[in-house]
A protein has these predicted regions:
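Penicillin-recognizing serine hydrolase domain
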Residues: 1-119
Length: 119
């Protein structure tokens, strides 16, 4: 298998990602807690070497209601973004594929959800 997801035969739909994300949220919620952090420290070689990892997802540092997500980019697929937000006690999952402005598109979708649905 190709764990990087870069191999061209590896592709999925928004429905596939929704199923995967629901599973992770139910069975392994700590994964998204990690992806919501602005930065984290890891240790290599039995704690002899400390490294700081910075999250490239801007929501981790700018949106307190951001629960986690995953960014992605390839030349073939362009920008992709999976984001989970908390809004009025509900988890909002937004998935954006194939865009050069994935964060702007996610913001547009999030604002639409807030206007279109009664919570």
């Amino acid at each position: 298998g190709d764990s990087t997801g870069i191999f061209p035969a590896n592709n999925g739909t928004a429905d596939d990602l929704e199923i995967l994300i629901r599973y992770i949220l139910e069975k392994h919620p700590g994964i998204f807690k990690i992806t919501a952090q602005e930065k984290a420290e890891i240790f290599e070689n039995s704690k002899a070497i400390k490294k700081e990892l910075l999250n490239i997802n801007g929501y981790a540092s700018s949106r307190p209601n951001f629960l986690g997500g995953k960014t992605g980019f390839t030349d073939e697929a362009n920008g992709n973004l999976v984001s989970i937000f908390e809004y009025k006690g509900h988890k909002i999952l937004l998935i954006v594929f194939g865009t050069s402005n994935r964060f702007e598109q996610t913001d547009i979708l999030f604002n639409w959800v807030k206007e279109a649905y009664i919570f």
